[in-house]
């Protein structure tokens, strides 16, 4: 005649988060809550936040890896918005995905138009004169 409230057995195990079950670092529960509160749909399935969280984590890791490479190329140990800008704009797929996104303090890609560069003829002539 147990009431269902008390613990009879000692088979008590620690709860495992959905992020840990999916092998993710980003919080699945928080994404689920934001999907519910955002009024994107009347109902949200149990797999949708896990999938969305994994996509967000992958994109973040990809951008941070490229930005870290850009920071190392500039002999810096800290990623700044300029490194994010260089990473995104130099990657074709990320540039297409984030084409209309403005990154504050990101600057622009270095680009000199071909007509403004010195011609190859003048470079060869200058070296022969010496």
Swiss-Prot record:
Molecular function GO labels? DNA binding; protein heterodimerization activity; structural constituent of chromatin
User: What PROSITE patterns would the database entry show?
Assistant: HISTONE_H2A
Major subcellular location class: nucleus
Instruction: Please list every transmembrane segment annotated in the UniProt record, as residue ranges.
Output: none
| Residues the record lists as N6-acetyllysine modifications | 5, 7
Motif segment ([ST]-Q motif)? 127-128
PTM (free text): Phosphorylated to form H2AS128ph (gamma-H2A) in response to DNA double-strand breaks (DSBs) generated by exogenous genotoxic agents and by stalled replication forks. Phosphorylation is dependent on the DNA damage checkpoint kinases MEC1/ATR and TEL1/ATM, spreads on either side of a detected DSB site and may mark the surrounding chromatin for recruitment of proteins required for DNA damage signaling and repair. Gamma-H2A is removed from the DNA prior to the strand invasion-primer extension step of the repair process and subsequently dephosphorylated. Acetylated by ESA1 to form H2AK4ac and H2AK7ac.
* Listed GO biological process terms: DNA repair
Q: Which domain of life, per UniProt? A: Eukaryota
The modified positions for N5-methylglutamine read 105
Q: Name one GO cellular component term.
A: nucleosome
Modified residues annotated as Phosphoserine in this record? 127
Report the residues modified as N-acetylserine.
Answer: 2
Q: What else is known?
A: In contrast to vertebrates and insects, its C-terminus is not monoubiquitinated.
Query: How are the domains described in the entry?
Result: The [ST]-Q motif constitutes a recognition sequence for kinases from the PI3/PI4-kinase family.
The Swiss-Prot or TrEMBL record describes its family as follows: Belongs to the histone H2A family.
Report quaternary structure and partners.
Answer: The nucleosome is a histone octamer containing two molecules each of H2A, H2B, H3 and H4 assembled in one H3-H4 heterotetramer and two H2A-H2B heterodimers. The octamer wraps approximately 147 bp of DNA.
Q: What does this protein do?
A: Core component of nucleosome which plays a central role in DNA double strand break (DSB) repair. Nucleosomes wrap and compact DNA into chromatin, limiting DNA accessibility to the cellular machineries which require DNA as a template. Histones thereby play a central role in transcription regulation, DNA repair, DNA replication and chromosomal stability. DNA accessibility is regulated via a complex set of post-translational modifications of histones, also called histone code, and nucleosome remodeling.
Q: What is this protein called?
A: Histone H2A.1
Q: Source species, please?
A: Meyerozyma guilliermondii (strain ATCC 6260 / CBS 566 / DSM 6381 / JCM 1539 / NBRC 10279 / NRRL Y-324)
Recite the lineage of the species: Eukaryota, Fungi, Dikarya, Ascomycota, Saccharomycotina
């Amino acid at each position: 005649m147990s009431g269902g409230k008390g613990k009879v057995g000692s088979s008590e195990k620690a709860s495992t988060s959905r992020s840990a079950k999916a092998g993710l670092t980003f919080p699945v529960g928080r994404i689920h809550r934001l999907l519910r509160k955002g009024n994107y749909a009347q109902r949200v399935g149990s797999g949708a936040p896990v999938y969305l969280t994994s996509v967000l984590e992958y994109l973040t890791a990809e951008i941070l890896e490229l930005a870290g490479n850009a920071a190392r190329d500039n002999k810096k140990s800290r990623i700044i918005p300029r490194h994010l800008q260089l990473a995104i704009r130099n990657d074709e797929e990320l540039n297409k995905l984030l084409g209309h996104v403005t990154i504050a303090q990101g600057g622009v890609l270095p680009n000199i138009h071909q007509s403004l560069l010195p011609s190859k003829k003048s470079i060869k002539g200058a070296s022969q004169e010496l």
